[in-house]
């Protein structure tokens, strides 16, 4: 299966071969150039071998295209054993003649190779295997091992060029791995590998604030287009998953159907409730009632026999159940009926890309109509602003794609007074923003709520008082006799000033 790159006459277009790797085909605009070689470069542990095997595995399972894996480092038995952790039964593919592993690893006895370096024998073995198995895809792991075995770099470069030229004549699509020393240094260790390849893909595993963050960048795809920049990816139980945030399109449908927040007075403030496919952000200081609003939102889904999923990053499941019970909400009964799924995790337990993959997988399996994250600010701890922004875009984009109502909380740093909700650009991504805040009135602490923003709908612009009772939140009238409520210094308006 092949696709054409954009631009040019049809007979001159570079044909592309889909890799089948989630998200990767999006950033390379359809796949890798067919019949050409692609260099996969990265430091140790970035996932080069996994990427190569995933490329072959998908070719066999999704497109019925046999593949050849040439290994210069690991033994075939180790490759088969390691790949099983991703759920890939490569042994069965080998037995079905869909996959052939060509062992070119060094002699375990460590014998020196005499004479000049020549890949003629290996080239013929690869050529024979391609013809025998009718292979369309070839993976070579890794070119670095070839250079390490021989000192004459210029000769090795010449022989590798011969190998690539032969593979190009045969018409197979090839990926080759090579190791680099630094994440942002020279592309390859020996400085020549990238010049004998048509395309270059760089995998990185950068340490950011004590956490590793994997990214993939397409440096060049000769003769065709691709997306620029680095894109986060993970290596999960099913292999490589790329998150092509820049490739997301704003093409999702928009619903006029309203759903309830679970708080009648809040629905009135929102013009009749939230839109069915909207993203709602509740922001406020600790203790203002954000988790309570999440619980009411989930309870309303249960009341309508709809599924909801809650991702909690600040409280344990037992604590969530206890708190919900104190408000008259029975999360356990919802779980027993299969209408609620709660997933609790420490934000620091893994990287943001892995959290995003967990969220997408859980939603894909449970298929809820509503989701909630409590809270986004917990996930922002210890990560770069750009990584957090990409995570939020990934979550909201996926929720929009699946037409799921998303309810997210954000803890403000300021206990009282105005606070920013735009530092991480969250406000521009969400459809509705609810502000919760403490205010001091007549020497007592009170809570205030305001619908700060609601796309496509009228909403109440007043700042209203609300209290938390055993039955949940009760929204009262606005602070009609005060102004500058959210400034942290409310001022009472006299009758003369009102006039």
UniProtKB/Swiss-Prot annotation:
Organism domain of life: Bacteria
GO molecular function, one term: ATP binding
Keyword Hydrolase: yes
Binding site for ATP 1: 45-49, 85, 220-222, 224, 226
SUPFAM superfamilies for the chain: P-loop containing nucleoside triphosphate hydrolases (SSF52540)
Residue numbers bearing the Phosphothreonine modification: 428
Post-translational modifications: Phosphorylated on serine and threonine residues by autocatalysis. Has a 4 step phosphorylation cycle; the autokinase acts first on Thr-428, then Ser-427. When Ser-427 is modified KaiC switches to an autophosphatase mode, acting first on phospho-Thr-428 then phospho-Ser-427.
Pfam entry (one): ATPase
PTM-bearing positions, type Phosphoserine: 427
Annotated Mg(2+) 2 binding sites: 291, 314
PROSITE patterns: KAIC (PS51146)
EC number in record: 2.7.11.1, 3.6.4.-
Residues noted as binding Mg(2+) 1 in the record, renumbered to the chain: 49
GO terms under biological process: circadian rhythm; regulation of circadian rhythm; regulation of DNA-templated transcription
Cofactor binding notes: Binds 2 Mg(2+) ions per subunit, one in each domain. Mg(2+) is required for hexamerization and phosphatase activity.
Catalytic activity entry: L-seryl-[protein] + ATP = O-phospho-L-seryl-[protein] + ADP + H(+); L-threonyl-[protein] + ATP = O-phospho-L-threonyl-[protein] + ADP + H(+); ATP + H2O = ADP + phosphate + H(+)
Domain KaiC span(s) in chain numbering: 1-243, 257-499
Cofactor(s) the record lists: Mg(2+)
Entry note about domains: In the homohexamer the 2 domains (called CI and CII) self-associate to each form a 'donut' layer; the compactness and local conformation of the domains varies over the cell cycle and impacts function. CII has the autokinase and autophosphatase activities, both CI and CII have (weak) ATPase activity; CI has the clock pacemaker role.
Anything else known: The kiaA gene has been eliminated from Prochlorococcus during genome streamlining. It has been suggested that the central oscillator in Prochlorococcus does not have to be as robust as in other cyanobacteria because the former live in specific niches of the Earth's oceans; they divide exactly once a day and at the same time. Thus gene loss, and changes in kaiC function compared to other cyanobacteria, can occur.
Family membership noted in the UniProt record: Belongs to the KaiC family.
NCBIfam families for the chain: circ_KaiC (TIGR02655), PRK09302.1 (NF006799)
Subunit structure of this chain's protein: Homohexamer; hexamerization is dependent on ATP-binding. Component of the KaiBC complex. KaiC interacts with SasA, activating its autokinase function and leading to RpaA activation.
HAMAP family noted in UniProt: KaiC
Record's protein name: Circadian clock oscillator protein KaiC
Organism: Prochlorococcus marinus (strain MIT 9313)
UniProt lineage: Bacteria, Bacillati, Cyanobacteriota, Cyanophyceae, Synechococcales
Gene this protein is translated from: kaiC
